[in-house]
């Protein structure tokens, strides 16, 4: 998505209005429950599927696979910019509903998107209830998700997304999201969402780090050229790259790493990868609710039955969407400035994750 070409003056004004009216949107969300109570009453509360991991690990492809079935409903670009009251916005915007052609997204990675493509907007809801968590230069790991009203608001929100997608003639029953920052909420998110199934893809650490560094440089340049692009990504809680970069501070890794280089260096992303996936591995015993998926295996378009069993859905629904997965082109990588001990640690961790991957099991 090219921000300069995709968002005109009126679009940008509308987005700025939405970005500055979070609390008003929460009020409108309450109004939605009254206005659309008949629609919402027909949506059962079934366990959500939450896809999370460091970016560039296959989370988008997984989201597209799930959202492309008749079973799951996800946010789409049409829910922007009033993400917290999507049914009202969808009703108001319907008379001027735009058609558009698929185009490559801003990452320039070959993934084609349109206004009807699924996207990661869930973090807007978390930001509305926990604004204090986003005020530092890093994102802290959440020790708890306690909030008097959050769990109900989350449940209500997922039902709205299911109801909204049904308006398009589909019949989804469950909510699915991609949200990289949910990695920071493992295992606390199960306190609020005990029935959630969490999928965490992971990737070869060197190739993953190279991809992360490349995207950081790309978005840093984009944000310098177009402040709206930076503001847009910040508003939806995407702190992955560029001027918005705020890494999740797993176990205080940022301050605990002597001589940590900046994010323009591969070693930075190797260290981040280690911190993130060591955190995941620590909580992998939550095997009934947390499933690990190796990126490289997804690229082979394997039988997805083990993933379907993990999230309790019909295997054919997922297997019919395997075309969304493809092998990534390898990056040429210079490892001369990465400490060998870090590389050894990352590779050992990768092997430990691989041994626990859903797709290496027999699907039972």
What are these regions (language model features)?
Residues 1-43, 213, 220-364:
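PAPS-dependent sulfotransferases, especially Golgi type II membrane carbohydrate sulfotransferases
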Residues 45-48:
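Pre-Walker A (Motif I) flank of P-loop NTPase domains
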């Amino acid at each position: 998505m090219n921000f300069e070409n995709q968002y005109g003056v009126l679009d940008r004004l509308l987005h700025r209005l939405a970005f500055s009216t979070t609390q008003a949107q929460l009020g409108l969300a309450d109004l939605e429950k009254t206005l659309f109570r008949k629609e919402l009453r027909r949506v059962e509360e079934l366990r959500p599927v939450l896809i999370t991991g460091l970016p560039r690990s296959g989370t988008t492809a997984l989201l597209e696979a799930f959202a492309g079935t008749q079973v799951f409903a996800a946010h789409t670009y049409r829910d922007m910019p009033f993400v917290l009251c999507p049914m009202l916005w969808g009703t108001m915007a319907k008379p001027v509903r735009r058609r558009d052609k698929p185009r490559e997204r801003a990452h320039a990675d070959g993934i084609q998107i349109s206004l009807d493509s699924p996207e990661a907007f869930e973090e807007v809801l978390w930001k509305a209830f926990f604004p204090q968590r986003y005020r530092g230069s890093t994102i802290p790991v959440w020790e708890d998700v306690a909030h008097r009203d959050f769990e109900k608001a989350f449940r209500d929100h997922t039902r709205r997304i299911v109801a909204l997608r049904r308006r398009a003639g589909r019949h989804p029953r469950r909510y699915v999201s991609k949200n990289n920052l949910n990695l920071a909420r493992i295992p606390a998110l199960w306190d609020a969402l005990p029935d959630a199934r969490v999928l965490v893809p992971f990737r070869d650490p060197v190739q993953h780090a190279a991809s992360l560094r490349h995207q950081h440089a790309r978005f840093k340049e984009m944000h310098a050229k177009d402040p709206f692009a930076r503001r847009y990504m910040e508003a939806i809680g995407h702190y992955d790259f560029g001027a918005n970069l705020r890494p999740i501070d797993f176990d205080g890794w940022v301050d605990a790493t002597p001589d940590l280089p900046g994010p323009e260096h591969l070693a930075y992303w190797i260290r981040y990868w280690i911190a993130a996936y060591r955190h995941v591995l620590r909580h992998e015993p939550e095997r009934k609710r947390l499933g690990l998926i190796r990126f490289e295996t997804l690229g082979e378009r394997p039988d997805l039955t083990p993933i379907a069993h993990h999230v309790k859905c019909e295997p054919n629904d997922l297997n019919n969407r395997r075309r969304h997965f493809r092998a990534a082109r390898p990056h040429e990588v210079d490892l001369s400035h990465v400490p060998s001990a870090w590389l050894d640690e990352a590779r050992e961790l990768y092997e430990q994750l691989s041994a626990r991957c859903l797709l290496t099991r027999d699907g039972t």
